[in-house]
C-alpha cells in the first residue's frame, strides 16, 4: 500500500523551493524521526512553511471535480475511488494541516485524486515517506510564468 502525506506549502516558500523539493522532504523526514529539541525545531520550521487546509472547500472541490469519476464515493467525510476493472483503489482523508492519501494496485485512482488537488491549488507537495518519493502536484514553473505574464499585463 502506498501512503502519501500532502501538504499545502505557503506560496512564497513554494516558489523559493521549486527544484529543491529534496530539502523540504528532508525537513519533514527529519521531523518524523527527531526527538527532543530537534523535534521542536523542525516542527516550528514545518509550521512556518505549511498552510492550514480548508477542509470544507476541498471537500466541495473534490465532490464537484470527481462526481463523474467511475467508482468515486464520499462516506463519513472520506473520499474513495475504487476501480476493480483497473485493479486500482485509493482513499483520501483531509485533516487540519495535511491530506492523507492511501492507494493500492495501479496508480489510476491516486492519479485522479492528485489531478483534482492540482486543479484546486498549485502549492501542494506529496510525500511518500516509506518509499522516499515526493514532488509537487503542479509544476510551479508554470505558476511562476503565469504570475509574471499577469504582472506584465499591468504595464501594457
Cite the ranges covered by each PLM segment.
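Acidic (Asp/Glu-rich) sequence patches and key acidic residues
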Residues: 1-97, 108-115, 129-156
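A common structural junction motif
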Residues: 117-124
Amino acid at each position: 500500500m502506498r501512503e502519501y502525506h500532502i501538504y499545502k506549502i505557503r506560496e512564497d516558500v513554494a516558489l523559493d523551493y521549486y527544484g529543491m523539493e529534496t530539502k523540504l522532504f528532508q525537513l519533514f523526514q527529519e521531523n518524523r524521526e527527531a526527538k527532543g529539541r530537534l523535534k521542536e525545531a523542525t516542527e516550528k520550521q514545518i509550521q512556518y512553511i505549511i498552510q492550514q487546509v480548508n477542509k470544507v472547500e476541498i471537500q466541495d472541490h473534490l465532490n464537484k471535480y470527481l462526481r463523474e469519476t467511475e467508482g468515486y464515493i464520499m462516506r463519513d467525510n472520506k473520499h474513495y475511488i475504487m476501480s476493480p476493472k483497473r485493479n486500482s483503489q485509493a482513499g483520501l482523508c483531509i485533516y487540519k494541516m495535511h491530506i492523507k492519501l492511501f492507494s493500492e494496485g495501479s496508480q489510476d485512482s491516486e492519479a485522479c485524486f492528485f489531478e483534482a488537488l492540482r486543479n484546486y491549488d498549485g502549492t501542494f507537495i506529496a510525500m511518500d515517506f516509506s518509499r522516499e518519493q515526493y514532488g509537487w502536484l503542479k509544476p510551479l514553473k508554470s505558476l511562476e510564468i503565469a504570475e509574471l505574464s499577469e504582472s506584465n499585463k499591468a504595464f501594457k
